[in-house]
């Protein structure tokens, strides 16, 4: 059986993932935690084969940073990064960390357990791009990376033209 560590701060999402693992004949839940900072410790304490890691976890811990550290000392552990945020930069950041897959919780057309199976069979599983969402009257696919940067700055309350543009 494949030992799975779930790192997810949302109790509802964690329960749903645990339920899928329990129904599987291939996977068993090793542990389920809400903070990425504890993922390293959990991996050192036992035999973890697969980690399902949220991008942002409890106490604002970065799943990407934790994944990169884990991959440094144990590259054999497979890691799938998950998020419900349709942010396009997460895919590239996940690849840069050496993770094996990426899954959009709310937008993915591929079921989580299918992504797990493919990753455990040696495949790297990534969506081609972030899902398109509506921003006002526009579709997110219509914006450039620079335009998204400007929108983020404005959304954070920055009004100084020099700091935004």
Label each PLM-derived region with a short phrase:
Residues 8:
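Conserved acidic carboxylate
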Residues 11-31:
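Two-component/phosphorelay signaling modules centered on CheY-like receiver
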Residues 32-50, 58:
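Acidic, metal-coordinating helix/loop segments flanking the phosphotransfer/catalytic sites
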Residues 54-56, 83:
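Active-site residues of response regulator receiver
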Residues 64-76:
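Short amphipathic alpha-helix used as the core "switch/output" element in two-component signaling
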Residues 89, 107-116:
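C-terminal output helix
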Residues 134-165:
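Helix-turn-helix DNA-binding segment
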């Amino acid at each position: 059986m494949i030992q799975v560590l779930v790192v997810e701060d949302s109790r509802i999402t964690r329960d749903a993932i645990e339920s899928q693992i329990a129904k599987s004949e291939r996977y068993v839940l090793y542990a389920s935690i809400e903070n990425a900072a504890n993922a390293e410790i959990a991996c050192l304490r036992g035999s973890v084969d697969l980690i399902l890691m949220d991008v942002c976890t409890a106490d604002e811990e970065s799943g990407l940073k934790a994944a990169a550290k884990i991959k440094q000392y144990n590259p054999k552990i497979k890691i799938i990064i998950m998020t419900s945020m349709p942010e396009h930069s997460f895919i590239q950041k996940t690849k840069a960390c050496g993770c094996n897959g990426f899954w959009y919780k709310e937008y993915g057309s591929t079921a989580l357990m299918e992504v797990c199976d493919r990753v455990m069979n040696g495949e790297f599983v990534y969506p081609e791009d972030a899902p398109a969402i509506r921003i006002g009257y526009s579709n997110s696919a219509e914006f450039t990376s620079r335009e998204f940067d400007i929108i983020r700055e404005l959304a954070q309350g920055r009004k100084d033209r020099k700091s935004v543009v």
